[in-house]
Amino acid sequence: MNAAYQKLCARLIMAGVPDARFDAAQLYTFVTGRDHRLDDGPTAEEASRLQVLAERRAGREPLQYLLGEWDFLDFTLKVGRGVLCPRADSEVVCETAIELLKDSEAPVVYDLCAGTGCLGLGIARAVPGAKVTCVELSHDAWP
């Protein structure tokens, strides 16, 4: 068993992080580029980075911010401070909009306060004739 991964899990569980094992696995792979189940352990540099990220996550910084990106529908978005993290319920909203718009010839869609742009981008990818405009005024939301 990978001791570093176990330590990372224990730290996140102790901090009360929801889905601590999932988060630990994501952080481990992000830092090392390897699967914790098949790895003997991180290098000293990787262990140091893992410790820093574990403390940030234990402090409730969103996993998506730590990773810098997050999958949404069938694509990956840049994510960071200044935007809300795309979540599963955002995918449901986007899928519902796609279902409503898919048979329209040239729907016009405005994604206001777009943040990552996940809703507008998801619709644009799935409804080829859609004219989609994403609007975000906050400079903090721009990568």
Summary of predicted features, one role per range:
Residues 5, 24, 50, 60-63, ...:
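A general structural signal for well-ordered alpha-helical segments in protein cores
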Residues 92-143:
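Conserved SAM/SAH cofactor-binding pocket of Class I
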